[in-house]
Amino acid sequence: MPQLRDSGTRSLHATEPVPSAEMDGFCRIFGVETEYGVAVTGAERPVDAGQVAMTMFQPIVSRSRSTNTYLTNGSRLYLDVGSHPEYATAEARDPREALAQDLAGEHVMRNLALKAQRKLRESYGAHATIHVFKNNVDSAGHAFGCHENYLVRRFVPLETIEHQLLPFLITRQLYTGAGRMTPDGFQITQRADFLDEAVSSATTRSRPMVNTRDEPHADPDSFRRLHVIIGDSNRSQWSTWMKLAVTHLVLCAIEDAFRHGTPSGFEHCAFADPAAANRTVSRFLDDPHAELTLESGESVSALGLQRRYYAAVKAFIETHVDALASSLPATTIDTIMGEWSRVLDALERGAYDALADRVDWAAKKRLFDALKRRRPDVTFAQMEQLELDYHDIANGRLYGSLVARNQMRELLTGDNVEYAVHNPPTDTRAALRGRFVDAALNVGAQFSADWTHLTLTAPERREAILLDPFEAEPTLGFEQLMEALN
């Protein structure tokens, strides 16, 4: 195996290359990282959010001696900078599986919050309530993220990601944006006012839309991990699934173009000013026909540019039907394209209410519009509270009531989510990681893990390296590790 050349450390040594069997096709690894916001209301005295987050993670620390751990479903659970609980899904081959793992993260966070709430009430009163927000901006204006991860063939240059993919990522927010009420009006995205660069390797001193730090968590000679920052955290299951699914198809077209030296159809889509275009798209409802300036000097609306991407992807699919069909185990290409076409048609008609059962911003807009009709004197602060309730996965009621009244589509059942809480995807290396973590916990062994390593730290150190994220079959090193564990 080659040396793993991640940024920061490129210290994984091995003896021979292990090329992935999936390098030549369109199969992909998907992942979603979600940072959650934490707040407390009803306490008899002030409670620090960091203290609440640590209380939530106390069961994790007791079990793993750390606030950074991997779970039996292969996912990562940890406290991020600023006391934001974060959940990173296990590697998935299909958007539907990635959605299940993301919802499992909601389930885990909700359980941690409700257990911590019971403990908190012993010291802060019976009405102390923990809120865990799956959103991207808090009431003080601090932004935090939802990051998508896509494994991309390394022969695609980063410049192409910026020029051909980024315009798609910006304009897909027409149907994947979570929406946000601001003092100046309603925006269809949460983070447009906070993202200031197109691409960058930094995430602290700048806020890029795509992060280029080279950490593939795979064979670095074959793949790069595309780290998308621009997306919102979604409550809608459809939106989470859709943003992964359509982005996969666009990436397939880009990869195929570079593989064969042919045009992708996206060569002339780059924005002259991506940050300005992003802010304009976020204010789509102010002017749905607002023109965005391309590098070429041409102007096009956000919807018009999405139509171009749709047409190019449709033409690409017609000549790659079988290869694309085999790239996704649980999602059909016809389903993705049908949903994409219908949502673009609804946007063109201005039929935003027709999207309210699947698009977060449309659902929230319908709620706000109905509230303003009933109560013309409603204040911004009251609408802000309503919005926070929509995103509260611990004690919020609004989103659940929409689901209960069949006003929000669900793609997965409660049983699907419960299964994903305890079980990793079976067709990626997450299956091996989950098996190892489960066995180590059962015998009380000291261990550590990351995306490419599994380590037994005592009584003697043993390690297995899992460099291929597509490979779910045990390696010799993994089998030896499990023997030592047992």
From Swiss-Prot:
Metal-binding among keywords: yes
Signal peptide start-end: none
Keywords assigned by UniProt, alphabetized: ATP-binding, Ligase, Magnesium, Metal-binding, Nucleotide-binding, Ubl conjugation pathway
UniProt-annotated catalytic positions: D80 (proton acceptor)
GO molecular function, one term: ATP binding
Its biological purpose: Catalyzes the covalent attachment of the prokaryotic ubiquitin-like protein modifier Pup to the proteasomal substrate proteins, thereby targeting them for proteasomal degradation. This tagging system is termed pupylation. The ligation reaction involves the side-chain carboxylate of the C-terminal glutamate of Pup and the side-chain amino group of a substrate lysine.
Family according to the record: Belongs to the Pup ligase/Pup deamidase family. Pup-conjugating enzyme subfamily.
The name this protein goes by in its record: Pup--protein ligase
Gene source species: Bifidobacterium longum (strain DJO10A)
